[in-house]
């Protein structure tokens, strides 16, 4: 890797570099290559391949913003003359890398697809805050704009149904409030034991309001 970095810097017009700069370049290039090859492995798995194919590599380079035409210039520096097979393959990939593979192409004609899905034109009305290097917006049939505020119902039948549903919810909430406010019966075993202990000690049960309240609170409702 040091030799590759030195060759690149020499082509850019640098004659020498320090050890610290070399270490920084090696670390940066190593990190970049690891992340790039990890993305290539993901594209290969998504294509259900065990080994990256030419299509996978072409798609990977396009996503990295590396044009296929630049590879031919780099290969000409090290392969002189460039083999015709490699040259033809690069030309073919440069022209077909953006095309849809035949296995994913629709069997319907474009007119029928337009009738089924609507307009397939890509919206180019890019807002000012969208930078240019981002991909274009998808076709209009792939997403649907939803209103921010819900539309109020206008049908009388639907309004009556919603009112009935809300009244039932209110009635259910009132019943729960009334059930909670009803006094609970003090028939728990703990309360009976408490009354027995008070009678044995000649104490008045009504004088222990806090204990009596707690026993009523935690008694199970029947």
Swiss-Prot record:
InterPro entries: Histone-fold, TAF8, TFIID_su8_C. Signal peptide: none annotated. Keywords: Nucleus, Transcription, Transcription regulation. CDD domains: HFD_SF, TAF8. One of its GO terms (molecular function) is RNA polymerase II general transcription initiation factor activity. The keyword Transcription applies. PANTHER family: TRANSCRIPTION INITIATION FACTOR TFIID SUBUNIT 8. TFIID is composed of TATA binding protein (TBP) and a number of TBP-associated factors (TAFs). Belongs to the TAF8 family. This is Transcription initiation factor TFIID subunit 8. It comes from Schizosaccharomyces pombe (strain 972 / ATCC 24843). The gene is taf8.
């Amino acid at each position: 890797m040091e030799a590759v970095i030195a060759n690149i810097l020499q082509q850019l017009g640098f004659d020498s570099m320090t050890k610290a700069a070399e270490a920084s370049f090696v670390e940066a290039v190593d990190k970049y290559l690891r992340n790039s090859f990890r993305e290539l492995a993901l594209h290969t798995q998504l294509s259900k391949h065990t080994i990256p194919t030419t299509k996978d590599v072409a798609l990977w380079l396009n996503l990295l913003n590396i044009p296929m035409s630049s590879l031919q210039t780099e290969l000409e520096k090290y392969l002189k003359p460039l083999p015709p097979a490699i040259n033809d393959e690069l030309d073919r990939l440069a022209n077909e890398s953006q095309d849809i593979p035949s296995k994913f192409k629709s069997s319907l004609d474009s007119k029928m697809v337009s009738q089924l899905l609507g307009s397939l034109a890509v919206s180019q009305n890019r807002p000012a805050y969208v930078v240019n290097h981002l991909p274009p917006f998808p076709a209009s049939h792939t997403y649907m704009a939803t209103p921010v505020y819900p539309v109020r119902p206008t049908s009388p039948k639907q309004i009556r149904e919603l009112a009935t549903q809300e009244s039932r919810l209110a009635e259910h909430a009132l019943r729960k409030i009334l059930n909670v406010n009803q006094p609970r019966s003090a028939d728990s075993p703990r309360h009976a034991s408490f009354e027995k202990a008070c009678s044995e000690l000649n104490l008045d049960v009504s004088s222990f309001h806090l204990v009596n309240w707690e026993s009523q609170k935690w008694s199970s409702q029947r």
